[in-house]
Amino acid sequence: MTQPVPPSLVLRPEVIERFDRGNGVVTIPFVGKWNCEGNRVTTGMTVFSPGTGIPLHSHNVEESVLVYEGEATAVVGDDEFDLVAGQATWVPAGVPHCFRNRGEGSMTIYWVYGGRDVTRTITATGETFEHLSDSDRGAGPARQGDRASRA
């Protein structure tokens, strides 16, 4: 099997250590400062069990999210969208957003951040922490009332 020429990477989800966000939400980190020098994007996948989500939050960088599998509800600012596999969002830095699994099976998203140093700010509390740090484990049951204006 051919290996990529460094500093290139080939990432296989089945061998990547998962980041358990709690309550049935698991992240598989792909490209980031943990494995790539000089990267300008941070990428990965997050798998949501039925009825779960991540609280309304914002980032210090832009983010694009592709629904890879399942059915999602995305809240972006004051707008709410139902999405299915193959549909995507783009969220500018600083805009509150969240994703919930609205389906009966697993929902998987593929995310891309436009930066190397990514933070998450929880809208309800104003708490900011580094993406995928120990503080970044606040997943839980999907909250239908998540809206940016309810911060």
Stretch-by-stretch model annotation:
Residues 78-93:
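Short acidic-glycine-tyrosine-enriched beta hairpin
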Residues 46, 90, 105-121:
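A short hydrophobic beta-strand segment most commonly corresponding to one strand
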Residues 27-31, 44-59:
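Conserved short histidine dyad/triad with adjacent acidic residue
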Residues 1-40, 124-151:
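A short, N-terminal "cap"/entry segment at the start of jelly-roll beta-barrel domains
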Residues 35-39, 48-52, 71-73, 115-118:
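Short, charged/polar surface micro-motifs in flexible loops or helix N-caps
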Residues 50-52, 60-61, 79, 95-96, ...:
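A generic "binding-loop/recognition-motif" signal
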